């Protein structure tokens, strides 16, 4: 039933203006016009590939301690370099079976990196 449908990532933030700057300027996502939906004050919808990332205003922003969204990218190391050049700071986690190569966590062929948005939501990159 849902296997052929796109999913939308939904992330809670405190300040939509701050979130918009981060997701557009740092990550390169593009704002989606919601038309006359009346949601523009509370929800920011962003295009990421063929997916959407919706950020919404919430007093619970940043309280999730797990990864909120993951981007599958062909070159994790190159994407990390590009994001660092835009001021994105990467996290370092001690995970079983994983080694570190700079900001990239490595386990066999798996390469992954984690970073946070301004509200502390955990975001990640992983190779296909």
Give the residues covered by each predicted segment:
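Amphipathic alpha-helical segments
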Residues: 17-30
């Amino acid at each position: 039933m849902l296997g052929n449908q796109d999913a939308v990532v939904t992330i809670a933030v405190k300040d939509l203006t701050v979130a918009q700057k981060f997701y557009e300027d740092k990550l390169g996502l593009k704002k989606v016009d919601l038309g006359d939906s009346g949601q523009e004050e509370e929800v920011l919808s962003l295009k990421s590939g063929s997916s959407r990332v919706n950020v919404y205003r919430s007093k619970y922003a940043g309280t999730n301690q797990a990864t909120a969204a993951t981007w599958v990218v062909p070159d994790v190391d190159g994407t990390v370099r590009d994001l660092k050049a835009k001021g994105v700071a990467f996290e370092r986690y001690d995970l079983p079976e994983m080694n570190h190569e700079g900001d990239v966590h490595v386990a066999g062929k798996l390469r992954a990196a984690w970073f946070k948005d301004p509200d502390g939501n955990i975001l990640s990159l992983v190779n296909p």
